[in-house]
Amino acid sequence: MSTSSPSQTAAPDPAAAAPAEASDADVALFGKDPMPRIVDVQPVMDGPSGEPATVRLYQRSEDFSEIIEHEEPFYPFFFVSDISLLKGLRDRFRFQELSGDNFYSHLVVFQSWDDYWDAIRQIERRTDSEESWPDEIYRVGSPTQQYLMQSGRTCLLDMTLDDLHRLQFDIEVYTEGGFPNADRPEDKIIIVAFSDNRGWTKLLHLDDETDEATLLRQTVQVIRERDPDVIEGHNVFSFDLTYILDRCNLHNVDFAIGRDGSVPRTYDSSMRFAERTVDYPAVDVVGRHVIDTYFQVMSFDVFSRDLPDYSLKTAARYFGLAPEERTYIEGVDISRAWREERDTLLDYALDDVIETKRLAGHLSGSTFYLAQMLPMTYGSSARRGPAAKIESLFVREYLRQRHGLPRSEWGSQSMGGYTDIFISGVMGPIVYADVESLYPSIMLNYDVKPSGDSLDLFPQLLERLTDLRLETKQDMKDAEDEEVRSELDARQSSYKVLINSFYGVLGFSLSAFNDFEEADRVARTGQEILRELIAEIRERGGTVIEVDTDGVLFVPPDGVRGEEAEVDFTVGLTEAMPEGIRVGFDGRYEKMLSYKKKNYALLTYDGDLKFKGSSLISRSNEPFGRDFVRRAIRRLLDHDVEGLHALYVDTRNKIVNSDWESVDSFARTETLKDTLSDYEADVEAGNRPRAATYELAKQKQERTGKPVKKGDRISYYITGDSAGVTAFKNSRLAADWDPDNPDENTAYYLKRLDEFAEKFEPFFTEADFRLVFSPEDMFGFSADGIEIQEREHESDYHQDQDEEVPF
């Protein structure tokens, strides 16, 4: 049994309406059965597969004090285009011909998993598709999602985030070999720190009476006794849980933390964050959800783009969540602290879980409320992509109405968002005008919907979500209680997530409801609206600097100064826009450094820097280079040319004199994305060149006799005497660098400094650039006469070009 405090006064819940009273759009959005407080749903797979399929529901009691378990019947199903493909199995399934003319015209339902998989295998044989999934079937892969779709139930109804029992944990590992490796027997887990949202904390650690195997058994016992609904951690999938599972295997300890006493199931998975895809080992725990705050921070940064990195400490400081007098220890010092400052390290570990709790509480709200709508569990809602979320809503409603499903179109989208740069240089003041919900507004006002959406769900759900969000935002303004306001904010954010996902469905190649022509129509219309906005800003005396998909950065007219005037000017642009399109004020900045398209820096009135794009500052660059560029940008924004020159000279002198804070200042750290054997095979086949990271990993393995595996991180620096050395032949592990006898390649790092400095070439004349970024100071440097350049850029779009408009 797990205990928790009763729910606090909650905000109005649109999902709580009885199905008989709910509108069609609400039933489609929230499901037909408002069963409350479902925490998790798990298929029962431990019996014979020929028996009737069932699921186990984990449900909080009315007072939230305990978990109630009960099993329910479940009927595995799929949609099929041709029912005759199942000829010969007629006594093993039930089917229904669906309404409409869509491709998947029949619903097929089974009583057992044996019958279900036999039917799929027969279709594979009859369609010659054993090598790939047959096009004749539309299958919902997750049994849990199938159950939630057919029952019309969703998780977490009538609950708030804190009604869930959320447990945070973090491990610390002792290693003498750089980054911990669970395959090395000596790389032991030394500390496991816990906290939860009930005010409880606990530290487990090695001591004279506790070896690692005992520590692992204690960890299992603590999790089972606390019985949380959610396990939260930072990078918990790729490190903490995976490492514990590996160490449990080493010591023959069952990591049996499932609510049914099972060991977690692991499998390879991936998540996409804008242009970046992250592979990770997913971990499923029966009856519980795993939430990784590392992924939450990455999701946040897709839109903010101003986090320097995704570490727990950085994120906690960014959001103002770090505990007062927080203990900080660098990762490389963990083992030393265990030997020399054990109490300090224990304080550090406890601060880690406290930060994780605060971070998860801050970032989990929208996902929590998404789970109240989607036929997905809380953990799945946190990890599934936007198109999958929308499609799950559509399939649930098509299933409820017994309507055939469309087949995804072949093809691709040809139009994208409108991005352009008109002026590079340093300008200010800056206003950001945002076309509010540009693509959703276009889709609503221009009757956009996929051709296969026979039920018109696309416009119905989009309109209902938009209305719900506006109503919730108004409730937020009216609410006096801060807790209620916070809950409402999370709820409106969940609506926003779904609203912004509709466009992605149109252009997603694997979506059953895709429509590339409609996706292109939305993008093309968006481009035209932004061009109208640009023209209107210019007509009213503003200077447009850049346009980026759904907003415009501009210098307001001379007579418009101060926040109130800037807001009035920006919002007033709406009157020139097409019906249903609103222009909003989305920020003001003291100055802007415009570099190239989709790459710029903004200086807030509080003195903070915000960056867009990776051309200026890339996380793959050496830390000293990132620091140099960041400081140089600030000096440019301040028009401090002398300070910029001094920064260059100072950084150069530090490189020449090996005046580094540590090897981390100039070392690169890269992750092994392949095994060493796969790397060698690719090199031998001529599929890739040799790389410093892998060559050093091989050296490390040979030197220590300890295995290096995929996912390990290698930190290294460049050696040698000339700037043009071959990296894999002239590199050493960062741990080998000796500050008393430095052997880094000074010429190479001076070249890297000059490469960073070249980013600023567009802001000066050629002669001035050579003066500013020159080490020659014999006669002293003077910034007199040096002007920061502004350059106009020819637009990708010309006002007089003849272009077909689709409306």
Indicate where each model-derived feature is located.
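Conserved RNase H-like, two-metal-ion catalytic cores of nucleic-acid enzymes
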Residues: 18-88, 143, 151-232
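C-terminal, non-catalytic extensions of nucleic-acid polymerases
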Residues: 564-807
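Catalytic palm subdomain of template-directed nucleic-acid polymerases
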Residues: 552-568
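Active-site cores of enzymes that catalyze phosphoryl transfer or operate on phosphate-rich substrates
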Residues: 155-200, 462-513
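Short active-site loop/helix that positions an aromatic residue
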Residues: 240-249, 436-450
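Catalytic palm active-site di-aspartate
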Residues: 469, 541-556
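Common nucleic-acid-contacting/processivity interface regions adjacent to the catalytic cores
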Residues: 2-21, 332-437, 441-446, 484-528, ...
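Active-site-proximal helix-loop-helix substrate-binding element of RNase H-like nuclease domains
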Residues: 202-206, 227, 231, 241, ...
